[in-house]
């Protein structure tokens, strides 16, 4: 309906299969539809993931955005509310084991520590096990990143562009300034659709991209600031043991 505040986003996969960083996370949800549960909303029955899979997805979705350019406090609030409501039906050990597989256990446990300290997360009500608390690290650096990120890491264009460094650090173990300025073809295909069938025009896309940088320099879109943010966030990935 025109003018409706409802926004529906549809994806063929939970996580983009062509991503070198999180493309294989879909395996964590193998068989999820065999475990699906039916819920009723407004008299309509809807089939969806069970509570364990649902919480795991909330964590992984936040984690994905964290590896890009960050996310805001709202997603932490969503996790806290969901855990409070359905914690007794969540297999916390299974969620933890899967978080460990993707090096996200310290990240997830620290998010719940943030939610307990500053939001409404109630560990007793959520049946939150002590085994999770052992993985929680210092909350302040993560909280500061949450406040600086905007809703989905888009607080500034500089922050958005810093994702090239964090993603490269995950795939290659270190940030790469060259990849920040001259990303590979697959990362530019949405911005420059002609690359999909004319890959040999990649140098042209690089030139256009750098020209846009040069002609649109402003306080929130500064390559130097993007590199600074990228280095800070790569250090954060190390602090939460996402990379070595």
For the regions a language model picked out, list residue spans one by one:
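Conserved NTP-donor binding/palm subdomain of two-metal-ion nucleotidyltransferases/polymerases, i.e.
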Residues: 1-244
């Amino acid at each position: 309906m025109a003018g409706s505040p409802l926004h529906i986003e549809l994806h063929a996969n939970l996580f983009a299969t062509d991503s070198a960083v999180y493309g294989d996370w879909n395996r964590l949800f193998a068989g999820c539809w065999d475990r699906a549960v039916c819920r009723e909303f407004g008299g309509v029955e809807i089939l969806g993931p069970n509570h364990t899979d649902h919480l795991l997805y909330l964590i992984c979705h936040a984690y994905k955005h964290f590896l890009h350019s960050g996310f805001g406090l709202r997603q932490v609030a969503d996790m806290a509310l969901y855990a409070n409501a359905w914690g007794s039906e969540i297999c916390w050990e299974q969620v933890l084991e899967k978080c460990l597989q993707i090096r996200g256990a310290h990240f997830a446990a620290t998010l719940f520590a943030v939610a307990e300290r500053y939001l409404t997360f109630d560990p007793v009500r959520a049946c939150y096990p002590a085994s999770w608390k052992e993985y929680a690290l210092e909350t302040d650096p993560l909280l500061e990143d949450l406040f600086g990120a905007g809703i989905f890491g888009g607080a500034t264009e500089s922050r958005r562009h810093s994702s090239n460094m964090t993603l490269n650090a995950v795939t290659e173990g270190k940030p790469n300034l060259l990849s920040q300025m001259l990303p590979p073809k697959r990362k530019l295909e949405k911005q420059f659709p002609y690359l999909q069938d004319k890959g040999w025009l990649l140098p042209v896309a690089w030139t256009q991209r750098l020209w846009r940088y040069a002609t649109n320099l402003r306080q929130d879109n500064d390559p130097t600031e993007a590199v600074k943010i990228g280095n800070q966030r790569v250090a954060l990935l190390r602090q939460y043991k996402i990379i070595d």
